[in-house]
């Protein structure tokens, strides 16, 4: 007996092929009566939608789409690890993708019908563009994105509080000539961290300089090498993430600069590598952030009740040997 097709389901349910497609993909413009009739016909015929096996009664995939700005690096490895762990507890799978600049936001629409909900981390996207690209019928939770309308639940890292904590620490150590290695100019996290650094340095009447980086280790190393070449004097460096702080640490050690005696260094995130090099940093609890995002989205999917609260994931200062002088 040949496999059932979508046309067979349409004939059995006495609806159009388009109605079957909309019903099984969970779109809004289908009555509940039609949705149930289509699901029953699909079950009787043993029809499996092309996007893969799914719970036909509710057109559920038990999969969550996770869209990140990148999949490279320890931050993203950690956040995905937390998401995968929490999704597994609830019997869900993850479908991962990235927002490549050359492809725009097309990946968001491409996941419709393949997942029950989306988690989107797009700190570089304009709010209007992101709001327009999110599929209307697909529940979505946003992580560290610019504020958008539409009532989507969101989780934000408390960047300002984290930066204030590390600045209080550095200034409390007597450091007065401060450097901040900033992240990409179009990244909301980088912007918030740079602005918090500027405000804290100005409030304490410290000399400071903000230099450009791109969140990579190489950019942190290059930034510090350039500062030393230009003869800029500094006694503390705060990297907008751990990778750049670690790059800065490598540049200083290569130049024979003593850390933390001559220059103190701190980062942001607390990736696993930060512990190995004993880097003072702002701990985000990255895996826990991923777990919380999944738990909140799946909780809404299961209860069918979504709230639009913007939740703040508060970081904490972790002091290690790159700022702590041994007594």
Give the positions of each predicted feature.
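N-terminal helix-turn-helix DNA-binding module of bacterial transcription factors
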Residues: 1-61, 324-327
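Residue-level detector of anion-binding/catalytic polar loops
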Residues: 16, 48, 88-93, 139, ...
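Periplasmic-binding protein-like
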Residues: 115-122, 179-182, 211, 231-241, ...
């Amino acid at each position: 007996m040949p496999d059932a097709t979508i046309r067979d389901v349409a004939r059995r349910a006495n609806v159009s092929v388009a109605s079957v497609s909309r019903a099984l993909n969970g779109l809004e413009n289908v009555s509940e009566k039609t949705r149930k009739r289509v699901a029953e016909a699909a079950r009787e015929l043993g029809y499996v939608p092309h996007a893969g096996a799914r719970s036909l009664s509710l057109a559920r995939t038990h999969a969550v789409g996770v869209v990140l700005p990148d999949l490279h690096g320890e931050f993203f490895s950690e956040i995905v690890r937390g998401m995968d762990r929490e999704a597994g507890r609830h019997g869900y799978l993850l479908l991962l993708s990235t927002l490549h600049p050359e492809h725009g936001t097309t990946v968001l629409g491409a996941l419709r019908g393949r997942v029950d909900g989306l988690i989107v981390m797009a700190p570089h996207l304009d709010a209007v563009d992101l709001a327009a690209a999110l599929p209307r019928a697909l529940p979505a939770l946003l992580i560290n994105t610019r504020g958008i309308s539409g009532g989507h639940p969101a989780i934000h890292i408390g960047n300002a509080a984290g930066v204030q904590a590390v600045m209080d620490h550095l200034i409390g150590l007597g450091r007065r000539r401060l450097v901040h290695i900033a992240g990409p100019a179009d990244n909301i996290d980088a912007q918030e961290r740079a602005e918090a650094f500027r405000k804290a340095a100005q409030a304490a009447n410290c000399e400071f300089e903000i230099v450009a980086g791109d969140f990579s280790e190489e950019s942190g190393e290059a930034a510090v090498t350039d500062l030393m070449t230009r003869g800029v004097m500094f006694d503390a460096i705060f990297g907008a993430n751990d990778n750049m702080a670690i790059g800065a640490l490598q540049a200083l050690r290569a130049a024979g600069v003593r850390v933390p005696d001559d220059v103190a260094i701190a980062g942001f995130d607390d990736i696993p590598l930060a512990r190995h090099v004993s880097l003072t940093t702002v701990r985000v609890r990255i895996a826990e952030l991923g777990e919380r995002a999944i738990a909140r989205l799946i909780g809404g999917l299961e209860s069918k009740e979504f709230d639009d609260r913007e939740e703040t994931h508060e970081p904490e200062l972790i002091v290690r040997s790159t700022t702590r002088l041994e007594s």
